[in-house]
Structures are given as C-alpha cells and as structure tokens.
Swiss-Prot record:
Family label: Belongs to the thymidylate synthase ThyX family.
Gene3D superfamilies, sorted: 3.30.1360.170
Example of a GO MF term: thymidylate synthase (FAD) activity
InterPro entries the record matches: Thymidylate_synthase_ThyX (IPR003669), Thymidylate_synthase_ThyX_sf (IPR036098)
Keywords from the UniProt entry: FAD, Flavoprotein, Methyltransferase, NADP, Nucleotide biosynthesis, Transferase
Domain ThyX, chain residue ranges per copy: 27-250
Residues that hold dUMP according to the record: 93-96, 104-108, 189, 216
Motif (ThyX motif): 96-106
NCBIfam families: thyX
Protein name as annotated: Flavin-dependent thymidylate synthase
Cofactors named for this entry: FAD
Amino acid sequence: MHNTTKRVTVPALEEILYEPIKVLDHGFIRVIDYMGDDSAIVQAARVSYGKGTKQLNQDKGLINYLLRHYHTTPFEMCDIKFHIKLPIFIARQWIRHRTASVNEYSARYSILGNEFYLPEPANIASQSAVNKQCREGDSLPKEGAEKVLAILEEDAKQCYGHYKELMNADEDGNIIDENNTGIARELARMNLTLNYYTEWYWKINLHNLLHFLRLRADPHAQYEIRVYAEKMLEIVKAWVPFTYEAFEEYRLQGANISRKGLDVIKRMIKGEKVTHESSGMTKREWEELMKIFG
C-alpha cells in the first residue's frame, strides 16, 4: 500500500532517515523521526498576532529575529528523535542535558555487546595545566600513546571476560558452564569499563537541541562528545536550514559581551588605549574579550 502523509516533510532528512551515520570507532547516530521544519517555527510565531504566510525572505528574517532576541517557544514546535550508540562515559556526560526524553539500552534485561571505544593516538593527551576538565592540545609521543591504548584494550577485554564469567553466559546469552549458575546481569554489569558502548533513543525539541549543540559543538567540549554534536549540526542544517543559518550567525559564530566588555569596546572606538589593568575586568574575562577580537 502506498504511504501518504499530509504533514510537513523535509526531503533532505527523509533521505537519511534510519541510516546510521558513523561516529568514533563503533558509534553512530540515526534519525528515527522528526516533526516540523522552518515553516513550523514561523507558523507558531505568527499565530501570536494572527498574520498569514509570508514570503520566504520574510520567514528567514523572522527566524533570525526570534533567535537573535532569544525567543524560545517557536523553536520548541519542532521535535526530532535519534537512535544513538555511544561510549558509556560520554553518555553520562550527555545525560546532564536534562531536557530530552531518553530510553537507554538496559544491561539489566540484556547483555551488553562486546564493543568498546579506543581513542585515536592523536587524541591521547595529558591533563591541561590550565583547564581542570580537559586535556592539553598536544598529543602524547607515539610510545606513550601506544602504551595507553594497550592498557585500555587489555582492561576492557579482561573486564568483558569477567562479565561473561560472572553471568555464566556469552554475549549471545548462551550458557558457558552448565554446572555454574552465574549471577544476575544487573550485578555482573558493574564490572564493565566506561568505554563500552551503550545505545539510547533520544528525543528533543529544536530549542533544547540548539542549546545542547552550542555547548557540545564548541571547541572547548570534549572531543568524544563534540564529534557527535558536529554530526548533529549537519542534520540540523538539512532539517531546518534557515534556523541553522541563524544559529550559526548568532550563537556558534557570535559572541556574548558583558557590560564591562562593551565599555572597553566603546573606549577603544574612541581611540583610548585600554589595558587589562584599566578595564575593570578579571584576567580571564579580558583574555576572552581579546580572543573575540582576534
């Protein structure tokens, strides 16, 4: 039977629906479903004052205005659902964004697959001396990176072997030793390392997705979550191109400047030589402001 729909569809998104987009070594993102497009945002905004459909350039201008002035409700009219496979340690960071509906693969009911994440040597670096939550920019020497990878792989394989031994079952659920009862899956899973992969369905509205992407596609975000965010940016661009363009203009490539920062800029425009000491800003604020202006 031929399927028909009266709802808005986006051809560029229909093309990738259900298709896995590879991320990291064993991860992926799949678009499972979506609701709305750029026109749904415009429709929601215009109902506030009863105006009809406008020209595309006016729609684009309205979306720019809404995003620029932090109007949020119209963007909440669009939803998207993803199927995502990701390392457990990234899932725990990801779930800090509490504005999505999530259902995760349960290692209480099922046996977790034998797939774990190993970083590329170029992404193995020491702890930053400046930022307490991230790595340095320079990679470890080849020998150091190889040692790290060997330890990570050995630990993951050993723990998965013990995981199966504790359950007395292989990854397909087959009994290993008929004379051993094993322990419950909900207990055996505690021994697995955090680089093992989990999966979940993640449904979120566009407003909250953009907030997630603003933080996680940022160069300061951890590499392993940033690569997922970068793939999602490509999906958003295909789904809502006007919104993506406005988001890139006002959020990704734009900047928020404090009152003191604006005062510094005004003084500089007038020809005054402003220094950190005379700015009234903290060292970090001053450095961030100077970075904005190159």
